[in-house]
């Protein structure tokens, strides 16, 4: 415990300590009954109720244990004495005892004092152990001021910190705005082809429905009741229910009744090499104008026309 107090006083730059290290450690090693060793810490100036006060602390090592008188007092070095507040002895790790005394006076009262000395001994009149005089006034004073002093560069540091905070706030605000704008943008602007391919996409045209080539060869279901069953409607249903813009669907002319003596011959349709499907005209025709209407598929009509015999009239073109 004594060594820690000595190190603290050395760090504070105590001017009242002896210069020899052996004298510093000797009282602590002697134990009980050895000579007390006082030391003064540099005075500290405090501001109390608008007035300056000077605080001086005296540390005494290797004092008598509790129950034995060991007073501590301060003087100006001329025989005067000032009572100080003394704390009770506290045990140290090496078995010795330590006491602490403090003196607190206004700076005006201590202004008349040039030096200050701390004493300890069996009685107040016995100056058995004393510290070296501590200078309180003049240029050589080692008093320290604990007032709040303005630090240099504080205002510039505050301005830099404020500018950095403002820059970080602007970057965060820009990031939030960009994120919100991207979330509210259409799918095409975000580069999402899956969302932009829907039928409600405003920036892409609607896909055209292309009729399948084999839809003309497949039989179609009968029309519902109450709907028109004309050739134009059948063709529209066969092509998916839609017609191109500007196109008109016209019905095929009705077939005349066939005479028994004169056979009607039509030219055999040829297959288009560019089209893999053999298209043989409209899928639905009226066979008789006076008889009931019936529908034949394209493949049945082509087979019927191909099986007809050649015409007997030589005036028929192509006969």
From Swiss-Prot:
Keyword ATP-binding: no
Signal peptide: 1-16
Transmembrane segments: 161-181
Ranges of the Extracellular topological domain: 17-160
Organism superkingdom: Eukaryota
Residues the record marks as carrying a glycan: 78
Compositionally biased residues, Basic residues: 260-271
Bilayer disposition of the protein: Single-pass type I membrane protein
Gene Ontology cellular component list: plasma membrane
Residues on Cytoplasmic side: 182-319
One GO biological process term: alpha-beta T cell differentiation
Subunit structure: Heterodimer with TCRB; disulfide linked. This heterodimer assembles with CD3 proteins into a signaling-competent pre-T-cell receptor complex. Interacts with RHBDD1.
Known role: Component of the pre-T-cell receptor complex (composed of PTCRA, TCRB and the CD3 complex) that has a crucial role in early T-cell development, particularly alpha-beta T cell differentiation.
Protein name as it appears in the record: Pre T-cell antigen receptor alpha
């Amino acid at each position: 415990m004594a060594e820690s107090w000595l190190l603290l006083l050395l760090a504070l730059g105590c001017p009242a300590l002896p210069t020899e290290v052996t004298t510093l450690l000797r009282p602590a090693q002697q134990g009980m009954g050895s000579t007390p060793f006082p030391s003064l810490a540099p005075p500290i100036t405090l501001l109390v109720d608008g007035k300056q006060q000077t605080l001086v602390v005296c540390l005494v090592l290797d004092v008598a244990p509790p129950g034995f008188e060991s007073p501590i007092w301060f003087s100006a070095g001329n025989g005067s004495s000032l009572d100080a507040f003394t704390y009770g002895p506290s045990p140290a790790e090496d078995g010795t005892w330590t006491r602490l005394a403090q003196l607190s006076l206004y700076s005006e009262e201590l202004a008349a004092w040039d030096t200050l000395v701390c004493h300890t001994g069996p009685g107040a009149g016995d100056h058995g152990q004393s510290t070296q005089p501590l200078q309180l006034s003049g240029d050589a004073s080692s008093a320290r001021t604990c007032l709040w002093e303005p630090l240099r560069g504080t205002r510039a540091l505050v301005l830099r910190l404020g500018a950095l905070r403002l820059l970080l706030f602007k970057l965060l605000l820009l990031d939030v705005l960009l994120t919100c704008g991207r979330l509210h943008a259409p799918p095409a602007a975000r580069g999402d082809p899956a969302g932009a391919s829907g039928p409600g996409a405003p920036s892409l045209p609607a896909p055209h429905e292309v009729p399948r080539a084999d839809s003309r060869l497949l039989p179609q279901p009968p029309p519902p009741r109450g709907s028109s069953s004309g050739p134009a409607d059948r063709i529209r249903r066969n092509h998916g229910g839609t017609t191109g813009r500007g196109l008109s669907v016209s019905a095929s002319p009705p077939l005349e009744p066939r005479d028994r003596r004169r056979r009607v011959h039509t030219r055999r349709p040829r297959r288009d090499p560019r089209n893999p499907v053999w298209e043989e005209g409209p899928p639905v025709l009226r066979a008789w104008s006076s008889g009931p209407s019936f529908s034949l598929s394209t493949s049945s009509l082509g087979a019927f026309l191909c099986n007809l015999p050649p015409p007997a009239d030589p005036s028929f073109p192509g006969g």
